[in-house]
A protein has these predicted regions:
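N-terminal structured subdomain of primase-like DNA metabolism proteins
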Residues: 1-101, 157, 163
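Phosphate-handling DNA/RNA-contact segment within nucleic-acid enzymes
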Residues: 30, 102-117, 130, 156-295, ...
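Acidic beta-strand-to-loop metal/phosphate-binding motif
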Residues: 67, 256-258, 297-308, 313, ...
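Conserved active-site segments centered on acidic
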Residues: 80-135
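Arginine/glycine-rich "motif VI" loop of SF2 helicases in the C-terminal RecA-like domain
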Residues: 319-327
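C-terminal or mid-to-C-terminal helical accessory/interaction module adjacent to the motor/catalytic core
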Residues: 327-392
Length: 392
């Protein structure tokens, strides 16, 4: 039976791969990963590596995820492996129902529409109509390779142009509304493009699938940024901008760093900080913290040094406190002088931001400093009280 990809994604995310594999073989830490002697071929020198979401043997080529490991190591069928892991994760394997099949059909169709829209936006960016948007991105210091890597595009002027273009491929207006690309006004009876006169930023899930968009207006209009609405494939609370690229970067040794905006993420990746991600126009959520900890045991939160950025840092720190454990913590880094990561890199280059990361503080120290600054009182008694609260 075919299982919904969303269920399989959640099962893989909830399954601690190193713990599953560690039951059958001895593993040792190797940087951010684990390694051991491959269970699938005889070897004396470890060449079997376990990452957050897959294993790979550089000796025999064995490769797979948690489901694949159970199948290969136990000779289990696919469904047997899924049922075993789901039971351990406290998940129910979905039964084949007409409703489940319809929900999966909807998700598939939304994915197709979003992918087609991304391609259309990218084409427009490199047509004459997208010249101003392209110049804007280049003037912000982005290279053409970076623009293409992140799939940046140009919405066009709206007026139904997207529906007209995608309609040629059989994508109907109703599907574009469901995908968060158009909106219907019941008062006027008109359906309009959600994004127009905006630079487009595809939002991708952790597996690299386009699930929504953010759009930045050209010029000084408001709102500066618009994000797509909640849909069957997109949740602002659960997803992180840049997570697909950051997962690979962190796997290769990059620091996982959380910044505030799309351009911050892109500028950091271009400068070589391949673990950069950002929340999607909202304060950091518990779901996003969980996603961060799936990638790294100690992400660095790096918010702007202005009052709004410091409030965001304090809220994120407060949210994380009940969730901390020996293998799940945070660091906080602050950019002084009113800069953000994007502007800091343009002024000082890679070294400027590296200095910020190097100065990142463990959560307790950083939160203590935030509380001290907020209080305006620096007496020894108050400092001791703050420290006691943080260590409770």
């Amino acid at each position: 039976m075919a299982l919904p990809p969303t269920f399989l994604d959640e099962l893989r995310a909830r399954t601690p791969l190193a713990a599953i594999i560690g039951r059958r073989m001895r593993l040792a830490r190797s940087g951010r990963q684990w390694k051991g002697c491959c269970p699938f071929h005889g070897e004396k020198t470890p060449s079997f590596y376990v990452y957050d979401d897959h294993f790979h043997c550089f000796g025999c080529g064995a490769h797979g995820d948690a489901i694949g490991f159970v199948m290969q190591s136990q000779g289990a069928a696919f469904m047997e492996a899924v049922e075993q892991l789901a039971s351990e994760a406290g998940m129910d394997v979905p039964k084949p129902t007409p409703e489940a099949a319809e929900a999966e059909r909807v998700r598939h169709n939304l994915g197709s529409a979003l992918q087609a829209a991304e391609q259309a936006f990218q084409r427009r960016l490199f047509l004459p109509e997208g010249r101003n948007a392209r110049d804007y991105l280049l003037n912000r210091g982005l290279t053409e390779d970076t623009i293409r890597r992140f799939g940046l595009g140009w919405s066009g002027e709206g007026r139904g142009a997207l529906a007209s273009e995608l309609g040629k491929d059989g994508i109907e207006q109703g599907l574009l509304i469901e995908a968060g690309l158009m909106q219907h006004n019941p008062d006027t009876g008109r359906t309009n493009d959600l994004f127009f006169n905006r630079v487009m930023f595809p939002i991708r899930d952790r597996r690299g699938r386009t699930i929504s968009f953010g759009g930045r207006i050209m010029g000084d209009g408001q709102p500066k940024y618009v994000n797509g609405p909640e849909t069957a494939v997109f949740s602002k609370r659960r997803n992180l901008y840049g997570a697909d690229l950051a997962r690979e970067g962190v796997r290769k040794g990059a620091t996982l760093v959380v910044v505030e905006g799309y351009m911050d993420v892109i500028a950091l990746h271009q400068a070589g900080f391949d673990g950069a991600v950002a929340p999607l126009g909202t304060a950091l959520t518990e779901d996003q913290l969980t996603e961060l900890w799936r990638m790294s045991p100690m992400p660095v939160l790096c918010f702007d040094g202005d009052p709004a950025g410091q409030r965001a840092a304090a809220r994120a720190a407060e949210l994380s406190l009940p969730l901390l454990s020996p293998d799940k913590s945070l660091k906080l880094a602050t950019i002084a002088g009113g800069d953000d990561p994007d502007s800091l890199i343009r002024k000082q280059g890679k070294a400027g931001f590296q200095a910020v990361l190097d100065a990142a503080q463990p959560l307790a120290d950083a939160l203590y400093e935030l509380l001290r600054q907020a209080s305006g009182d620096t007496t020894p008694e108050l400092r001791a009280a703050f420290r006691t609260r943080l260590e409770e």
